[in-house]
Amino acid sequence: MMGLLLRVLCVSALISPALLLFMLLLPGTATAQAPPSWEQIVAAAKKEGTVTVIGPQGNETRDALTLAFQKKYPEIRVELQGMAGNQIGPKLLNELAASKFTTDVIVTGTTTALETLVPGKAVVPIKPVLIGPNTRDLSEWRGGKLTFSDDPQNYNLIFSSYVKAPFIYNANLVSANVFKSWKDLLDPKWHGKITLKDPLSAGGGLGNSTLWYTHEGLGKDFMRRLLTQKDIVMPRDDRQMLDFAARGKYPIAIGPSDVLTNEFIARGLPLKHLHPETLKEGTYVTAGNGSLVIVRNAPHPNALRVYVDHLLSPEGQLEWSKATRFASLRRDVPKDHVLDILVPKENMTYRDISMRHYVDMREEIVQFIKSVLSR
C-alpha cells in the first residue's frame, strides 16, 4: 500500500499545475462535480503564459484584441495573427489535419465560421468556456441572452453588430433626398455612376445581394436590372471604391468596408452613409468580424477561458467597439463613438444576414449572380 502511494506521489510531482487543472476539467474525472474556481483557472492560465488568437487584419483591431488584455494579465502573452476571412479556413483545417494544434481562439465573420470551420469540425462548443465573471451574467446582453449564428447555438458567438447603410455617396454630387427605394438606383441618370463591391465573394456586395434576393419587394428581377445596368463597376478593392466615390468618378458605392468608410469620412472626405431608414425596403444588420469560435484541441485551455472572458467584458467590448466603430451587443458598453445610424435599435426588426439561414443561401445567390453576369 505504501509503495502504491509513493508511486502516485511521484507521478503527481511530474504533472504541471496547468496540466493537472486541465485534467480536472475533463468530464468523467473524479472531481468533475467540483470544478475549479475562477481564481484557480486564472492562476493556471498564467502558468500557460500564452493565448494564440487569429483575428481580422488592421492595426486598430490588433490593438483592441491585445493591449488591454496584456495590461490586465501581463503574465499571459497574446500571440495574434491578422488574417482575411478566406485565409483562415484553409490554414486551420490543414494544421488540424496534420495534428498541429497552435490556435486557441478565432475572431472572424460568421460566413467563415459557418461555411468552413463548423462543418470542418475545427471548433468546439463555446458555452463550457463561458465560466468567468463577465460571461456568467447575461443580464447586460441584448435581450438578456447571448447570440449565436449557428442553429444549435453552440459554436459561433456574435458579440457585436451594426446596421449596414444601403450605400455610401459623395455628398457634393448626390442628394440623398431623391432616394426612397432601392429601385431608384435603376434610374438612367445613375448609369455609369455606381460601384458595387464584388458580389461573388464575402463582403458588402454579397451582403446586399442577399438582402435583394430574399426581399419580396426586390428579388431576382431587381437584381437582373441592376447587375446588367450600363457601366456598373464591381471592384474587389474597398479603398478603390471609396476613392472613386470621394473623387466623384463613381459617386455611389454599394457595399464597401464600413471600417474603411469611417476612416475616409474621418479624413474629411465628402462621403456619407445613406440613412438605413431612407429606403422603404430597408437594409440589414451584420456581425461583420464581430464573432468568435473556440478551436478544437486548443493548446492553452485555461488562457483561452480568461481571454474570452476579457473580450466579452465591458472593457474588452469597448476596446473592440472603438476600433471597429460598431456597437457591442452588451448594453452597458457606451455607443457615443458609433454613428447613430449604424446602431441597431432594440425596438426595430432587422434582417440579420449573419444567421445560418442566410449564410446557407449564399451559394444559391452566387450562382444566380453568375448566371446574370454571363449573359
How does the language model describe each region?
Residues G290-I353:
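Mature extracytoplasmic/periplasmic domains
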Residues L6-L19:
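Short, low-complexity, charge-dense intrinsically disordered segments
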Residues A34, K345-R375:
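Conserved C-terminal helix/tail region of periplasmic/extracytoplasmic solute-binding proteins
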Residues P35-K46, T52-R77:
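Short, polar/charged alpha-helical segment
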Residues M223-T228, I232-P235, G268-R296:
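Periplasmic-binding protein-like
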Residues G55-L67, E79-L93, F101-L242, A246-R247:
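Extracytoplasmic ligand-binding site segments that recognize negatively charged/polar headgroups
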Residues P166-L173, T210-T214, A287-H300, E319-W320:
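A bilobed periplasmic-binding-protein/Venus flytrap-type ligand-binding module shared by bacterial periplasmic
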Residues T112-T116, I252-K272:
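A ligand-binding cleft/hinge motif common to bilobed small-molecule-binding domains
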